[in-house]
């Protein structure tokens, strides 16, 4: 026998069947309800109380719900967890509905189409991407639905396609067919939602977006993306900008691993923004400026004229402090024009949004004046182009009250005097309400009941309320009973009914007319979307440039000189983020000198001495220079790098199950395969993840390969001191080292980079700083001394490679250079060699020592006088004797 269900649940199930992979938020009055499996899972994810519908039924239906005014908060939680949410609205007034209220899904919200972003997310782009592959070529399109940005490109292999999508930080990717496993695997590992769009619009249907595209594959992938948006959003996409095709090779290429290693956007410890280059450089005053800054960092320029143009503008703002301050004061009053324009076009804008838009537009004439006072040719064109959209600002100013409610369907948004018909309705409402007040006073005098009152509720409308003790004072045949309460009765009169009809009719008509007026205003503003978007882009760029000027002044950055050759000269360079965290401590600056005759700096020195920081600071200076910012140095001259490759730190790819050494080799191979003589390579401790001989052989072979064939500017740090001999055979390699010294038996890091190789590794000293047990350190020192006495050496390093790399792979050279495997033997024993695990007579730590150490650790120095401290030390001395 079929299971009985209500008409409403039948309606619900029909809608749910259309969106099986989404949470269905089903509108019932003032709540959105979830049913069945959605309710069970939703209650858990959203921490809601799970209840049931039809409690008395044999199989009650699980349900939970959220208030409609708070729904966005709950939607955000689900979207952040990677789910989709379908919003099913009531399509008619339940009071006027004949039978079942009509309902329909008005929007499908997905991780890539979320528009209502708050907090720090508001300063980030939320990109939805699409990918389509054919014959090994992959076309990608992406958009931020909240801003209308739309771009596309093509890539020649799957790895580059994945790298591009990862760099975009897309949470969702739309596909129209099968993709190579190396791409889909990355989607799964990075929790990127993969959405299928079976039907794709023809190019002719979206030619207004693709008219500037010549590539058919790019036209198709844009159509794929737009098709998905129309399917899920079910509304106008008028704010979508024309698709712009770009070539990744037109910008400095920084792969995902390198961006992670350099901490450009997210720090490696917590994944947060603090401690990154974007965090340091962000002195923007607008959300759209902050987003543009990140896009610039993500894609540094390689065109010298474009770099110089940005630098000229930064210089101008840097030289004019007062004008820059005035500019900041105006920019800080500008709201997020990009996303406001998006909400206008999308139909989700409210009265408060329009007031924010008006406030923002009112700042534009002031910004134009600031640029005019600069009287600079570099800002002359921008000053002329800035469009204050006076017509839009005046329209909003004349029509919308200054503090409108959020809801646009309940009235109270439009100013008095803007519409004659609306004013008439309001007059009827206001006069009618005054009539009610006068009627109450009249009825009190007529009946002699001083506490008689006239009230209103949604069920009974207007009523006259009289307490039961005063009922006998009411005139007969004039009062019609409407409701009985415990201590009172509610009545109506013919006069009250007549006025109620007039007031309620005016209020209902007023609310409906006001919404119609608001929609017309919204449509008028919508017609100026293109102008708004252009203004937003211009103000965002101006905001980033002033941000560069601020940080350049605050942190004493200098304007770098860019050359088209291969000369790299940095005087007193600094790591900008490390320097900021050091606060008042003095940062030790370092030079990087690599002329046309130097391609590789081989860096030696102890751990913790600053080798990695030295390498990172060069990469950050290069990125900063090529986004148009000034750089942390006394002076800087740099070539324009086409790519940056890094292998710094033990960034194990634990997600994909790769070891440190495997990731190291993959990243090294990526650099060796794709780097050019205009690239920058940073290799930190290559070869440390395998056996010593293998590691050293690989390190030397990589150095030689870069020297002979790649010729990129390369910083290569190593603990293989034997590699420093390569300076004698590789003409364009120079040794440098990070200094350290011993003082009273303690290791002191100098953090200064000097010419030549390091003379000592200080490994045991570093172990001491790490807190290794003292007995272990003594044993290590004994072993080291015996090794040094016997001059135990590693086998000879391989000979430098020659041009036969063209015919032999690197692996062949490594195998050739690797030592022949022999039977394992002790390194050194006491009769001429040392047994590594031999028992050595040494004093063990006593229980007294341990007690004293424990007491020392627990000592409250802040609560002791100098005499107390001396007495305690004297007691310890006596115990130790």
Curated annotation (Swiss-Prot):
Q: Which GO terms describe its cellular component?
A: cytosol
The record, for InterPro entries, names: DNA_mismatch_repair_MutS, DNA_mismatch_repair_MutS-lik_N, DNA_mismatch_repair_MutS/MSH, DNA_mismatch_repair_MutS_C, DNA_mismatch_repair_MutS_clamp, DNA_mismatch_repair_MutS_core, DNA_mismatch_repair_MutS_N, DNA_mismatch_repair_MutS_sf
Keywords of the record: ATP-binding, DNA damage, DNA repair, DNA-binding, Nucleotide-binding
Tell me one GO molecular function of this protein. ATP-dependent DNA damage sensor activity
Q: Which GO terms describe its biological process?
A: mismatch repair
Q: Which PROSITE patterns match?
A: DNA_MISMATCH_REPAIR_2
Reading the lineage from the top rank, the first entry is: Bacteria
The UniProt record lists the keyword Nucleotide-binding? yes
The free-text function statement in the UniProt record for this protein reads: This protein is involved in the repair of mismatches in DNA. It is possible that it carries out the mismatch recognition step. This protein has a weak ATPase activity.
HAMAP family on file = MutS (MF_00096)
PANTHER family registered for this protein in UniProt: DNA MISMATCH REPAIR PROTEIN MSH1, MITOCHONDRIAL, DNA MISMATCH REPAIR PROTEIN MUTS FAMILY MEMBER
User: Belongs to which family?
Assistant: Belongs to the DNA mismatch repair MutS family.
Q: What is this protein called?
A: DNA mismatch repair protein MutS
Q: Which organism is it from?
A: Limosilactobacillus reuteri (strain DSM 20016)
